Amino acid sequence: MHKKETSLSHSKIANEMMNYINTYIDTPINIDHMALEFKISKFHFHRIFKEQMGENIYECIQSIRLQKASNLLITNQSSTISKIASLCGYSSQSSFLRAFKQRFEITPKQWRQGGYKEYSNKILKHSNTLSLIEKNYISQEPKMVNIEKRICYYIREKGYGFNSLKTWQKLKAWVYSNNIKEYSLLGIYHDNPILTKPKDCHYVAAIMLKEEDLLENTNLPYFNLYSGLCAEFSFEGKYEDILKLIQWVYHYWLPTSGYEATTIPSYIKFEKNDYFDNTGTFVVK
């Protein structure tokens, strides 16, 4: 296998595994079974994942579980701590409590009672663009919309904003080279930006196709966009304003809305994307 083919194969394996982890985070994830699915040895599987994602696969799974839980503890006020632990794949509440305290330095109960704000401040004081926002930062009620499953081709990046312009320009070139006429631009936010250091945040820039058929001879990975009921907000501003919108939704709107979040990540549909179309602004839903 040529070097380019090997690199594409390794990228495909790692990306498919990340999609699997995020989709089935509420279940036990068997690495031996997944290695068999990819028809490679467990050792080779671990090496490929770390080479592509920059972290150990077990550490990655643990990190995703805890990030999901840290959000749900804030948004899902009527859910018990044990239920949230279960939703994020922990079969034992004691192991969840131990892992959570080791990561965030406080208990889930203390976190839920407002401890997350102090944790956020430690992250935000090193950020030039983000800050804790007030409850009245945005004043609007969303539309409740049902999202259908659609095929998305994507580029995954680690770190909010570090490579976004370059990533979207690559996707623009991909759209033109594949002669795609009807599509939508999506940004998928796997981490809450004020609960995770910007350099550690996972972000996916995606092209959602109108057609249901898969493309042939393309080197980009794909996934099926999650279907279900979503709250849709309209917003216009700069790139960093999008992250402030996400903060407001998670920390102010959701906890008092009567709705509860799931482990599915939030995403943005761009009506205008300055990194893609040079319009000078971002208009999102």
List PLM regions with ranges:
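N-terminal intrinsically disordered/low-complexity leader segments
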Residues: 1-8, 32, 39-40, 50-53
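Short, Lys/Arg-enriched, disordered terminal segments
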Residues: 1-11, 127-134
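A solvent-exposed interaction/effector surface
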Residues: 43, 47-48, 55-59, 63, ...
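A short, Lys/Arg-enriched amphipathic alpha-helix from helix-turn-helix/homeodomain DNA-binding modules
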Residues: 3-29, 59-79
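Detector for methionine-enriched segments
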Residues: 1, 17-18, 34, 53, ...
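Short secondary-structure junction/hinge motifs that connect adjacent elements
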Residues: 30-39, 185-188
